[in-house]
Amino acid sequence: MIDLMPKKNTFLLKKKYKEDSNNSVINNLFDFFGKEFCFHQITLTGFPIIWIDKTLLIEVGKFLYHLSQPYIMLYDLHGVDERIRLHREDLPKADFSVFYHLISIERNSDIMIKVPLLENDLILPTFTGLFPNANWYERETWDMFGIIFNNHPNLTRIIMPSTWKGHPLRKNYSARATEYEPFFLNEQKEDLEMEGLKFKPELWGMKRKNDNVEFMFLNLGPNHPSAHGAFRIVLQLDGENIVDCVPDIGYHHRGAEKMAERQSWHSYIPYTDRIEYLGGCVNELPYVLAVEKLANISVPEKAEVIRVMMSELFRINSHLLYISTFIQDVGCMTPVFFAFTDRQKIYDLIEAITGARMHPAWFRIGGVANDLPQGWNILLKEFLDWMPKRLKYYINTALKNSILIHRSKGIAEYNKKEALQWGVTGAGLRATGLNFDVRKWRPYSGYQNYTFEVPVGSGISDCYSRVMIKVEEIYQSLFILKQCLCNMPSGPFKSEDSLTTPPSKECVLQNIETMITHFLQVSWGPVIPENESFQMIEATKGINSYYLISDGGTMSYRTRIRTPSFPHLQQIPSVIRGSLISDLIVYLGSIDFVMSDVDR
């Protein structure tokens, strides 16, 4: 039997180093800029949040970027409408705020910089001079809140159509369609929308021709099979060579962050499944963990192991689809049909446990929905016996094929520095040789108790290394699943906290208050204490996270969902310029994205 006890003090040492690093950077900021210009907000996020005046923004960014152990990655950037927030005690006066979430790999720590803004002065300097991936994040922040970023290279809508009116994440923008005029689409309006989709190269700094050649502009998507969803890339071509390109996203947008403001903390769980629709329970995990931090709910050990088991099953399921469709994009059809056979076995196991297949909505605040059914271990063991042999088949018949290797090795390359500049996470980052897996470096749900390795590349991330990293990750997930099978604890599958679990019959018979509390929490939803929390996880396609702000109500005041696919698509032009169209198809297949994850 595999030992599930934590390895000797490794997790505690990392945690202590992280706390010391946080204290150090706070003191450095206060010493350099002065305490009167920096306000330290205490939250449940697990990292320091520092409010600064907007005049200091670029200087603070440069200061953090050039530390001896620098904050090298802009992980996230977005906004908050602060106007109707009730619990803002001691926070700087603000109608809106913009937050900048930075990560230091060397410190294994984060910091969030917040800038308060008044409604009559919603202007900030662009961060693109320091972090190129700020481009799309600033466009989305303007799109959703109307906050202007001076000197931005192209501050246009990115999620909503160019013809859209208003900024949807403002609090005075209704979340319900019934509060608007009925939608209609006549011929005139259709022409207007089609005109808005017309690509104008000059708006993107592109020339239609140079001295020797007239460029062709080609729409790849939004209905192209190799675009992997409703995704459009406009290519500037010189023959078959890509001179430049512009990714166009937003076709799959469903307003997931806005929906969170009108759903109870509990009833929002089904929406999390659909953020990245192949990840299933993996998507539920960062949300419920973040809510549990806010509510100070401890999860039983059995529930933690079940969560890990389900997450790894969905990870394998997603990776199998990715590997097989990548092989298909390169030109081999057979493996994709074998992969669907293997994925069917996983879905049968998931359905036996949860009652659903792709979108179980099965994790709960405080645990999981049900205990494991009888026979779950037999199904899991059968799958664990089956899968390693099948993986060898994929490797020997397709991934060692000389044509596939020739078509993918050395294609769409980038190094560690470039990956960090663009906010790349997951297999794409680890293929550059950087060993950064959240399950190891920032363990959650008990991952520190499992033995597994983190596959890394040799220094350059290309199409072939990215797919081979995912193959190795399947082997590691199988090893984690074996540990779950051999060491499943007994005990409850859900916390007994009254915020999430109905009272026992004994309590009901003795205390009428328990019934009143239960009635209110079922009808209105649990009331979560005011605070802020954050949780990142190693999802199937990279790092996924939820940043939650509670105002002490039954619904979230602000839910920010940071997905890995969004920055991965933003990186495309910097990687593919100078390559062939055929190389772009292979590159898209190697990224591992779905558009629901990008557009939310």
Swiss-Prot record:
Topological category with respect to the lipid bilayer: Peripheral membrane protein
Domain of life per record: Bacteria
GO molecular function: NAD binding; NADH dehydrogenase (ubiquinone) activity; NADH:ubiquinone reductase (non-electrogenic) activity; quinone binding
Localization terms from the record: Cell inner membrane
Chief place of localization: membrane
PROSITE patterns per the UniProt record, alphabetical: COMPLEX1_49K
Keywords recorded for this protein, A-Z: Cell inner membrane, Cell membrane, Membrane, Multifunctional enzyme, NAD, Quinone, Translocase, Transport, Ubiquinone
SUPFAM superfamilies the UniProt entry points to: HydB/Nqo4-like, Nqo5-like
Reactions accelerated catalytically: a quinone + NADH + 5 H(+)(in) = a quinol + NAD(+) + 4 H(+)(out)
Region (NADH dehydrogenase I subunit D): 214-600
Any one GO CC term of the record: NADH dehydrogenase complex
UniProt keyword annotation of S-adenosyl-L-methionine present: no
Region annotated NADH dehydrogenase I subunit C, chain positions: 1-190
Documented EC number(s): 7.1.1.-
InterPro entries: NADH_DH_suC (IPR010218), NADH_DH_suCD (IPR023062), NADH_Q_OxRdtase_suD (IPR001135), NADH_quin_OxRdtase_su_C/D-like (IPR037232), NADH_UbQ_OxRdtase_30kDa_su (IPR001268), NADH_UbQ_OxRdtase_49kDa_CS (IPR014029), NDH1_su_D/H (IPR022885), NiFe-Hase_large (IPR029014)
Subunit text: NDH-1 is composed of 13 different subunits. Subunits NuoB, CD, E, F, and G constitute the peripheral sector of the complex.
Function noted in UniProt: NDH-1 shuttles electrons from NADH, via FMN and iron-sulfur (Fe-S) centers, to quinones in the respiratory chain. The immediate electron acceptor for the enzyme in this species is believed to be ubiquinone. Couples the redox reaction to proton translocation (for every two electrons transferred, four hydrogen ions are translocated across the cytoplasmic membrane), and thus conserves the redox energy in a proton gradient.
Family designation: In the N-terminal section; belongs to the complex I 30 kDa subunit family. In the C-terminal section; belongs to the complex I 49 kDa subunit family.
Protein name: NADH-quinone oxidoreductase subunit C/D
